[in-house]
Amino acid sequence: MPELPEVETVCRGLEKLIIGKKISSIEIRYPKMIKTDLEEFQRELPSQIIESMGRRGKYLLFYLTDKVLISHLRMEGKYFYYPDQGPERKHAHVFFHFEDGGTLVYEDVRKFGTMELLVPDLLDAYFISKKLGPEPSEQDFDLQVFQAALAKSKKPIKSHLLDQTLVAGLGNIYVDEVLWRAQVHPARPSQTLTAEEATAIHDQTIAVLGQAVEKGGSTIRTYTNAFGEDGSMQDFHQVYDKTGQECVRCGTIIEKIQLGGRGTHFCPNCQRRD
């Protein structure tokens, strides 16, 4: 699943490819992806100009002339831009045709991705309704607010970080990496964490996601950026998908368990449960 670094990388790529382009028509081959009224979606998009791109958590934002298109890639969503006629591809579901002859194509093998069209004034309310936490940056991710939220919850810390309410953008890969760096067991109840552990998780969340953005995200199976290029953050993973390998910090064998239905990687020595 694309997490914050992958979505940010896609966003930056699309900025170089489609800003300023005017949509001439829209073609939708899998209508279930569109969460706005379908007729409204098809009626409103033509004649809109893509003014800028943005991101909030794992949501990709297309700022148009007087609307915002919100796209969530879910498990396998990808965007590809073709300067002229695009090739026929099996998993292409939405086509944005531009006046200059180019086409932006949304592909999704699993068909889990979604798109919605809003007026800009409703964007903040939209994310409030999703209970989306702050961005993982020094200015937005307040340590004291984070510690207070942890103290009120019995959820395992991994599950809590994944639910997007504490901080936006973490998924299965980067939660494992953050908790390994912070030396916290993923099954620890949130309210049992010390101030030092909470601080370590806070700081490592910012550091890991920042590094992953610099590396263009992680390509584990199928992720590519808007140019079809792989990310390289997977080369810097210390624990995710390292089951049976030695922990680089202590030499103990990395283990994998199921936690909240998610495969979870950790070092049983560095990340003790008790």
Swiss-Prot record:
GO molecular function: 8-oxo-7,8-dihydroguanine DNA N-glycosylase activity; class I DNA-(apurinic or apyrimidinic site) endonuclease activity; damaged DNA binding; DNA-(apurinic or apyrimidinic site) endonuclease activity; zinc ion binding
InterPro entries in UniProt: DNA_glyclase/AP_lyase_DNA-bd, DNA_glyclase_Znf_dom_DNA_BS, Formamido-pyr_DNA_Glyclase, FPG_cat, MutM-like_N-ter, Ribosomal_uS13-like_H2TH, Znf_DNA_glyclase/AP_lyase, Znf_FPG/IleRS
Cofactor: Zn(2+)
EC number of the protein: 3.2.2.23, 4.2.99.18
Signal sequence, start to end: none
Catalysed conversion reaction: Hydrolysis of DNA containing ring-opened 7-methylguanine residues, releasing 2,6-diamino-4-hydroxy-5-(N-methyl)formamidopyrimidine; 2'-deoxyribonucleotide-(2'-deoxyribose 5'-phosphate)-2'-deoxyribonucleotide-DNA = a 3'-end 2'-deoxyribonucleotide-(2,3-dehydro-2,3-deoxyribose 5'-phosphate)-DNA + a 5'-end 5'-phospho-2'-deoxyribonucleoside-DNA + H(+)
Assigned protein family: Belongs to the FPG family.
Function: Involved in base excision repair of DNA damaged by oxidation or by mutagenic agents. Acts as a DNA glycosylase that recognizes and removes damaged bases. Has a preference for oxidized purines, such as 7,8-dihydro-8-oxoguanine (8-oxoG). Has AP (apurinic/apyrimidinic) lyase activity and introduces nicks in the DNA strand. Cleaves the DNA backbone by beta-delta elimination to generate a single-strand break at the site of the removed base with both 3'- and 5'-phosphates.
Quaternary structure, from the entry: Monomer.
The protein, known as: Formamidopyrimidine-DNA glycosylase
Species in which this protein is naturally found: Streptococcus pneumoniae (strain ATCC BAA-255 / R6)
